């Protein structure tokens, strides 16, 4: 029996629940035929046959419903290859036959492509609705559908909180995580936009006063870095040649261009943000908030200046916080590219060398992975219990290259088993050595300049680049007979997150924030539930990090950003002196305030003030975002008083520590309140192969390319616009040819949003596949064609009723209203619980499987053959179901729902836009559970008959029977007989119901619905070789027995109960399906055996 029977056999093991049938799959993309429609997939006008999406990496989420990878892929491939060879032979044989045997078919001419759509609506006015007869609107056309609506929404003020219905149901406020002005948006931004806008639109339709504040982040390091690269690429200049003022002017130009691009993209994606309240992290109010926070924290002693060890990026010439450093693990000797070096640099090697003991011929051997740092060594540590070195404790080793003695000290930190058991100490260039240096009062000697070259303290190596010295130091040690050996060593290499330069721990004067007190407060509000973080894994990570929080280095050696409001006091006679630990500093919101503070503090002394040239860490100012965009530090600002604290922050889990925790800390410290009460962390998007998206790999996808579509050649061209190296462009081009051989088809914003939400399950990372996106574009076309059909069946004078009178409704009408009510409840529950994937599943199932594939199909017979009263009733039901369906979908798919809703006849009380229409709510009077259960039983019968007709190729004049063995089942099936006949398809012309005592006809294939009902289809006349058919079914029965045995063994295995509930349910369903199929095979064999008698 073919695969179609397997699919429909799901129903035989599940009593009367249609919901269970359809919900066993998540969203099927690409979609097989519907459970309810004809076995062949119905392709609506404008649809193409979907291509199967490949299985993605197991570590990440695939598209919901995407086919799981098969275990016998190799066997399947071999079969496919064999079939292809056979087909080729057949084609060759046909080619040799005389041409006269059949006239060649003329090739169908391709429909000429439509010219780009030009909308006639005046800018900002309500869209001029075109007829469905218009070439651009006969089928779903994203560019035509999405035109003009956003400009009207914005101009009409629908994005403002003031647009809500009165009285409001409450407030719902989201501060948009501000995108960096470093370039175009990517799919991660599109995901965030889609999730946040879905919630904003949902709450707005529910009557809430909603506010979604947009804006951009200046992104200090990232933006300065990208502009510096551009400057070098275009003019072969470095920023120092321009000077600070001209360079920052250049960055402001960049910001202006890309800020506008970002805003345009946010609008095209449908984000209903209040643009009248747009913010930028370096605008006037956010700058004031940043200065206020720095000064208050400094005055409280929480910000201090200290010469401490920091993570230093020599390529960007700036300090970094620990969160801005990533690690690369290597297992042994590895050559790596390092910015600023023509040749690869050696890592993963442990270099052994000896120090001479002062006044002795004896030596002590040490080992290091960074031999160049030995120029900064100021001590040697050994374990106090290591007998090899007991006699050397308290003595000194002599440095071979500089005039320096290194004391030999004992410390339990030293591992006797690692290396030689003796550890060289470089307190100024290693975080562990820094602590040992403090414990043993060692000298802290910095050997590096800010650019990574060696300074005067490096003796004869002065001026060399740090990794050049890695080799020259070993060469000189070898000449002196002090080099011992090299050996492979696994290690973790710290890298700058932005530049990928190897980080150097270095002693510099920086500004720091004491984090202990604020960290404890931020941890407490989460533990007390004042801030809810989801998913749970993000909560655990948040708590773990805050439990061991370190002080935060907030100064960055940059020109782009908020210049630190701190001023060094330079007293008369001390001009030209470098900063030292005795230097005096004052802070002020303005220079005038700083001057006044200094005059009060140093009364009678002459001085000048010199502002710190450094900028604040971007995350310091971004940490004030939720309150500063609403007017803080002006606590009397109306927006701040009304909308702070905000309701929710939606963001990626990867910036939970960078940003989220710091917003909570700073808000609690500055305002005494949490900045938001809910944090939802979405997954990270990877490519279809599970790789992190990177410009150098070419797998970063611009959301606008998805919305508008783009040719492959244009994708290649975009790679040349950025700062990629030639080899990176080549690698990216190669990937694009593989991933997008035909470019990216136009999908539209609605399909993109729906797809991204369908991926969002709150689990692991997302494997993004453009083919899945294109498949959901077909769902948009289904919505379009179904709406077009319904509107075409409503008379010109149709008047929708405010409330439906369901007393005389037919069972199919009650069924669709019941299913609609279930969908309404499911959508509201899913969005309330932030279960976005579930929401898309509910919406898809109702619109596609239930409204389109069942009720619309069922309605055709009534509309053509029913009484006037029945027709009017069905028209009202169709209208009501479509209206509710569009409103259900609107938060996720704003453009197509507005376009179609505007075409619906208006009922009393309707407003101007679907945006402000009430979101559907559960209605108890539309609960028809009994009628729905009866109707679903009829659907299963129709499905079973269709399946059998497809299996035995019955295309016309089919005779089907439904055997009911109880009085109740007989009555139910009989009552649904008209609907069953309608849904059986064109191949079946006759359906009869048989009672318990009536004799079964001979020569029938059998399909078991449940213990009480069986459907049969006469196939005797269509089977030429009954023995062959029996043999075929017997073979399938044997395979089914093996499947049942395998599933039973799996379910009874120890530990199976520990796997996820979803996996357990899936495996149990496989067993139920196989058992149902077995019963069908057995009954069919019985019937076919009778044909032989």
UniProtKB/Swiss-Prot annotation:
Its EC number is 6.1.1.9. Residues 70-84 have a biased composition (Basic and acidic residues). ATP binds at residue 695. Pfam families: Anticodon_1, tRNA-synt_1. Keywords: Aminoacyl-tRNA synthetase, ATP-binding, Cytoplasm, Ligase, Mitochondrion, Nucleotide-binding, Protein biosynthesis, Transit peptide. A motif ('KMSKS' region) lies at residues 692-696. One of its GO terms (molecular function) is sequence-specific mRNA binding. GO terms for cellular component: cytosol; mitochondrion. It comes from the Eukaryota. It is found in: Mitochondrion; Cytoplasm. One of its GO terms (biological process) is valyl-tRNA aminoacylation. Residues 40-125 are annotated as: Disordered. Gene3D superfamilies: 2.170.220.10, HUPs, Isoleucyl-tRNA Synthetase, Domain 1, Valyl-tRNA synthetase, C-terminal domain, Valyl/Leucyl/Isoleucyl-tRNA synthetase, editing domain. Its main location: mitochondrion. Residues 45-69, 85-103 have a biased composition (Low complexity). The keyword Aminoacyl-tRNA synthetase applies. It catalyses: tRNA(Val) + L-valine + ATP = L-valyl-tRNA(Val) + AMP + diphosphate. A motif ('HIGH' region) lies at residues 179-189. Residues 1-44 form a transit peptide. HAMAP family: Val_tRNA_synth_type1 (MF_02004). Belongs to the class-I aminoacyl-tRNA synthetase family. May have a second function in addition to protein synthesis. This is Valine--tRNA ligase, mitochondrial. It comes from Neurospora crassa (strain ATCC 24698 / 74-OR23-1A / CBS 708.71 / DSM 1257 / FGSC 987).
């Amino acid at each position: 029996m073919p695969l179609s029977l397997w699919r429909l056999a799901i129903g035989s093991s599940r009593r009367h629940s249609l919901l269970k049938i359809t919900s066993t799959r998540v969203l099927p993309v690409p979609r097989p035929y519907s459970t309810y429609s004809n076995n062949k997939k119905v392709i609506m006008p404008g649809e193409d046959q979907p291509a199967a999406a490949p299985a993605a990496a197991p570590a990440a989420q695939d598209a919901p419903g995407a086919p799981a990878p098969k275990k016998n892929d190799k066997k399947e491939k071999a079969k496919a290859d064999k079939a292809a060879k056979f087909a080729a032979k057949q084609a060759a044989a046909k080619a040799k036959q005389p041409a006269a045997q059949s006239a060649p078919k003329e090739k169908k001419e391709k429909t000429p492509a439509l010219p780009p759509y030009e909308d006639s609506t005046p800018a900002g006015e309500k869209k001029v609705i075109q007829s469905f007869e218009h070439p651009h609107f006969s089928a779903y056309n994203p560019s035509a559908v999405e035109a003009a609506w956003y400009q009207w929404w914005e101009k009409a003020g629908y994005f403002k909180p003031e647009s809500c219905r009165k009285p409001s149901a409450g407030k719902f406020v989201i501060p948009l995580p501000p995108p960096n002005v470093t370039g175009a948006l990517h799919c991660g931004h599109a995901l965030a936009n889609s999730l946040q806008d879905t919630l904003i639109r949902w709450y707005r339709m529910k009557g809430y006063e909603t506010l979604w504040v947009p804006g951009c982040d200046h992104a200090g390091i990232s933006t300065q870095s990208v502009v510096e690269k551009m400057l070098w690429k275009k003019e072969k200049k470095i920023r120092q040649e321009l000077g600070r003022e001209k360079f920052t002017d250049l960055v402001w130009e960049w910001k202006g261009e890309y800020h506008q691009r970002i805003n345009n993209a946010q609008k095209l994606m449908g984000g209903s943000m209040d643009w009248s309240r747009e913010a930028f992290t370096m605008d006037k109010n956010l700058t004031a908030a940043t200065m206020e926070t720095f000064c208050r924290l400094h005055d409280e002693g929480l910000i201090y200046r200290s010469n401490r060890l920091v993570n230093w990026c020599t390529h960007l010439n700036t300090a970094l916080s620990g969160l801005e450093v990533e690690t690369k693990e290597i297992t042994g000797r590895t050559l790596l590219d390092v910015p600023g070096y023509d040749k690869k640099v050696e890592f993963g090697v442990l270099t052994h060398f000896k120090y001479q003991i002062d006044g002795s011929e004896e030596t002590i051997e040490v080992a290091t992975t960074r031999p160049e740092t030995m120029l900064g060594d100021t001590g040697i540590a050994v374990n106090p219990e290591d007998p090899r070195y007991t006699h050397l404790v308290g003595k000194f080793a002599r440095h071979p290259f500089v005039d320096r003695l290194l004391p030999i000290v004992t410390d339990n930190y030293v591992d006797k088993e690692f290396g030689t058991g003796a550890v060289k100490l470089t307190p100024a260039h290693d975080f562990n050595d820094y602590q040992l240096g403090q414990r043993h009062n060692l000298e802290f000697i910095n050997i590096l300049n800010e650019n990574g070259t060696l300074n005067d303290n490096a003796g004869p190596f002065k001026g060399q680049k740090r990794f050049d010295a890695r080799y020259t130091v070993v060469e000189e040690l070898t000449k002196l007979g002090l080099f011992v050996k090299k050996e492979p060593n696994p290690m973790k290499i710290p890298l700058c997150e932005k530049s990928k330069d190897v980080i150097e721990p270095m002693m510099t004067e920086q500004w720091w924030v004491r984090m202990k007190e604020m960290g404890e407060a931020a941890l407490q509000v989460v533990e007390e539930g004042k801030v809810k973080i989801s998913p749970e894994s993000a909560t655990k990570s948040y708590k773990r990090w805050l439990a061991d929080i370190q002080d935060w280095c907030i100064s960055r050696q940059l020109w782009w950003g908020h210049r630190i409001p701190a001023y060094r006091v330079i007293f008369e006679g001390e001009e030209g002196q470098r900063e030292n630990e005795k230097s005096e500093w004052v802070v002020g919101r303005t220079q005038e305030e700083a001057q006044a503070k200094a005059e009060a503090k140093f009364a009678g002394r002459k001085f000048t003030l010199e502002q710190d040239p450094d900028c604040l860490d971007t995350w310091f100012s971004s940490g004030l975002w939720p309150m500063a965009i609403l007017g803080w530090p002006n606590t009397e600002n109306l927006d701040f008083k009304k909308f702070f604290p905000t309701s929710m922050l939606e963001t990626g889990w990867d910036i939970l520590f960078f940003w989220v925790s710091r917003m909570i800390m700073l808000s609690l410290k500055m305002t005494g309140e949490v900045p938001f009460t809910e944090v939802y962390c979405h997954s990270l998007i990877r490519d279809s192969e599970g790789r992190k998206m990177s410009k150098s790999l070419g797998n970063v996808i611009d959301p606008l390319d998805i919305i508008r579509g783009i040719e492959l050649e244009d994708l290649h061209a975009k790679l040349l616009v950025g700062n990629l190296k030639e080899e990176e462009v080549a690698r990216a081009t190669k990937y694009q040819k593989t991933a997008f051989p035909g470019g990216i088809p136009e999908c539209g914003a609605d399909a993109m949003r729906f797809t991204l939400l369908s991926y969002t399950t709150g689990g692991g990372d997302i494997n993004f596949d453009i083919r899945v996106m294109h498949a959901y574009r077909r769902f948009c076309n289904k919505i379009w064609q179904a709406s077009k059909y319904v509107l075409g069946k409503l008379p010109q004078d149709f008047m929708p009723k405010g409330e439906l009178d369901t007393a005389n409704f037919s069972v199919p009408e009650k069924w669709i209203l019941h299913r609609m009510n279930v969908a309404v409840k499911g959508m509201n529950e899913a969005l309330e619980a932030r279960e976005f994937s579930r929401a898309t599943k509910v919406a898809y199932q109702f619109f596609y499987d239930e409204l389109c594939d069942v009720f619309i199909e069922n309605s055709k017979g009534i509309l053509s053959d029913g009484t006037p009263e029945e027709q009017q009733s069905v028209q009202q039901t169709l209208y009501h179901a479509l209206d509710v369906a569009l409103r259900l979908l609107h938060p996720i798919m704003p453009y197509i729902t507005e376009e179609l809703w505007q075409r619906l006849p208006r009922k009393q009380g309707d407003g101007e836009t679907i945006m402000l229409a009430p979101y559907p709510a559960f209605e108890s009077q539309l609960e028809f559970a009994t009628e729905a259960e009866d109707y679903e039983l009829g659907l299963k019968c129709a499905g079973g008959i269709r399946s059998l007709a497809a299996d035995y190729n019955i295309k016309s004049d089919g005779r089907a029977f439904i055997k009911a063995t109880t009085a109740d089942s007989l009555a139910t099936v009989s009552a649904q007989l008209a609907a069953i006949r309608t849904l059986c398809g064109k191949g079946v012309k006759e359906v009869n119901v048989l009672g318990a005592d009536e004799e079964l006809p001979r020569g029938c294939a059998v399909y078991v619905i449940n213990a009480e009902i069986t459907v049969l289809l006469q196939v005797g006349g269509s089977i030429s070789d009954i023995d062959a058919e029996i043999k075929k079914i017997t073979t399938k029965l044997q395979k089914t027995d093996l499947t049942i045995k395998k599933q039973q063994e799996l379910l009874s295995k120890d530990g199976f109960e520990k796997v996820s509930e979803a996996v357990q349910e899936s495996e149990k369903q496989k067993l139920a399906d196989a058992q149902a199929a077995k019963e069908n095979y057995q009954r069919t064999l019985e019937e076919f055996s009778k044909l032989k008698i």
